């Protein structure tokens, strides 16, 4: 719609998922979907439209494309498939199209990302074995499920998660890897952005974390207290009783370290 890629000719387009984001601009989810779909509608016939059919909009995105459709999935039959064999904080073992591959990345969402990468490379003519070898050398991006060594045998995981879907993916991943450890979630929401996702993120945090610390996260022109109140609105009494609301981010981080015991 903004024609940011107007005039460019793409060899491939990848649809991974469509989640709650950018609604401050698009206003409705349907409009957000329509704008995303335009990209695939305009792909040339000699391109590849690569889509995640595990997302409910995966097939909708490519229903009018002229490009060759290639599907991928971690849950069902598709042109290319993947599943997590095992995972820890150090990485995960994947089985992609029947071949095993180790990755330093963790989480189901990263399994999807790696499968999308693999599907695209193979569709464009790369050798599958060479792609898997190259994928095994990839390191996590800073601030994306970044594993920091904390004090007192505490695991500290930093992630940019700024949407409900991203926060849920991160917390679920940590729960799966360490189901018996206490999970403390420290987060905030940016100011002058989509306000409707704030209570949803509060609800997700109370559902998946043992303790929650809500703090500032680039409030821009908004009052931090107002942003925190929006997050709090998504929590019930139980969630609020397990939460601390600390505006100063440095103080919030110090508090998280202080209340975290060994094994957290």
Annotate each predicted stretch with a short phrase.
Residues 45-49, 179, 262-263:
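Short glycine-dipeptide loop
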Residues 235, 243-263:
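C-terminal structured "cap/appendage" subdomains that terminate the fold
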Residues 1-2, 6-156, 233-244:
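Acidic, Mg2+-coordinating active-site environments of NTP-dependent enzymes
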Residues 159:
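Conserved phosphate/oxyanion-binding catalytic-loop motifs
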Residues 140-143, 165-167, 172-238, 249:
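Active-site beta-alpha connecting loops in nucleotide-dependent enzymes
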Residues 30, 37, 41, 172, ...:
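Alpha-helical segments flanking ligand/cofactor-binding loops in enzyme cores
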Residues 4-7, 27-28, 61-64, 169-171, ...:
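Short amphipathic alpha-helical segments
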């Amino acid at each position: 719609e903004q024609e940011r890629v107007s005039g460019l000719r793409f060899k491939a387009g990848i649809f991974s998922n469509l989640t709650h984001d950018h609604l401050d601009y698009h206003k409705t989810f349907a409009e957000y979907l329509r704008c995303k779909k335009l990209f695939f509608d305009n792909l040339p016939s000699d391109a590849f439209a690569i889509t995640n059919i595990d997302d409910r909009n995966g097939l909708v995105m490519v229903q009018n494309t002229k490009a060759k459709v290639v599907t991928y999935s971690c849950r069902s039959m598709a042109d290319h498939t993947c599943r997590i064999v095992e995972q820890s904080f150090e990485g995960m073992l994947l089985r992609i199209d029947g071949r095993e591959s180790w990755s330093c990345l963790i989480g189901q969402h990263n399994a999807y990302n790696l499968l999308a990468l693999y599907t695209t490379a193979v569709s464009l003519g790369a050798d599958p074995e060479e792609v898997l070898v190259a994928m095994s050398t990839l390191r996590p991006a800073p601030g994306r499920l970044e594993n920091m060594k904390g004090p007192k045998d505490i695991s500290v995981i930093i992630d940019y998660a700024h949407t409900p879907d991203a926060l849920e993916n991160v917390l679920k991943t940590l729960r799966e890897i360490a189901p018996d450890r206490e999970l403390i979630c420290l987060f905030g929401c940016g100011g002058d952005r989509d306000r409707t996702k704030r209570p949803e993120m509060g609800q997700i945090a109370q559902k998946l974390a043992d303790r929650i610390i809500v703090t500032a996260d680039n409030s821009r022109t908004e009052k931090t207290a107002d942003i925190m109140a929006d997050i709090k609105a998504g929590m019930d009494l139980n969630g609020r009783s397990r939460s601390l609301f600390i505006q100063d981010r440095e103080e919030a981080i110090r508090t998280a370290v202080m209340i975290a015991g060994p094994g957290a």
